[in-house]
A protein has these predicted regions:
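Internal alpha-helical transmembrane segments of multi-pass membrane proteins
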Residues: 119-135
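Short, charged juxtamembrane terminal tails flanking transmembrane helices
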Residues: 187-197
Length: 197
């Protein structure tokens, strides 16, 4: 009887170890994936910031050329000079929106990476720590990106851009935090209904 019991315990331990190894492998893969995505976002931001004002202006000009007549009111009635001014303003808006989206992606990916270090049964502590870690990293990268632009011809370091980038970072992170909390609430509801049964 005791031998059977020991055999059953060993079998259960082996099964638990196998499940744990599979979970660790999956977590390692997800962690690696989000690390690569975070570094990819950093590289994309760096390359876009390394483009001088002329190249950056051409890129946003290409994007705004087609929608300009639709987006700008009375575009056809404006003089060529006024059209150019309006397109430049639209281009500036597109660049700011692009920057905001880049940093939104960085916030999302870096927060996802930090969340892979959180234990499943840990409720608030590590979620908050992951949030702070990702926020600190992303904002520091936004500041370093602005400092980088000092050395790029025609570009400048602007505090306003750091604020815009930080808004993008927070948007990405808050979306993810909302999804995590919703998933957690769903799991808790499922568990409580299972317990009641």
């Amino acid at each position: 009887f005791f031998q059977q019991d020991r055999h059953h315990i060993r079998k259960t331990q082996r099964k638990d170890a196998l499940v744990k190894t599979e979970k660790e492998k999956r977590t390692g893969f997800i962690r690696g994936l989000f690390l690569i995505l975070t570094l990819g976002c950093c590289l994309l931001i760096f390359l876009n910031s390394a483009a001088d004002s002329e190249v950056s202006g051409k890129q946003s000009g290409t994007i705004t050329e087609a929608p300009a007549p639709v987006v700008i009111p009375n575009y056809d009635q404006l003089s060529p000079g006024e059209q150019k001014t309006q397109k430049n303003e639209l281009g500036s808006l597109v660049r700011k929106a692009g920057h905001c989206l880049e940093f939104m992606a960085l916030g999302l990916c870096s927060f996802s990476f930090c969340l892979t270090f959180r234990k499943k049964n840990d409720r608030q502590g590590r979620l908050f720590l992951a949030f702070l870690s990702a926020l600190a990293f992303s904002v520091l990268y936004a500041v370093s990106d602005e400092i980088h632009q000092i050395f790029v011809p025609g570009r400048a370091c602007e505090f306003e851009d750091v604020v815009t980038d930080t808004m993008g970072i927070l948007c990405g992170m808050l979306v993810l935090a909302g999804l995590v909390r919703a998933k957690r609430a769903k799991e808790a509801a499922r568990q409580s209904s299972f317990t009641l049964q």
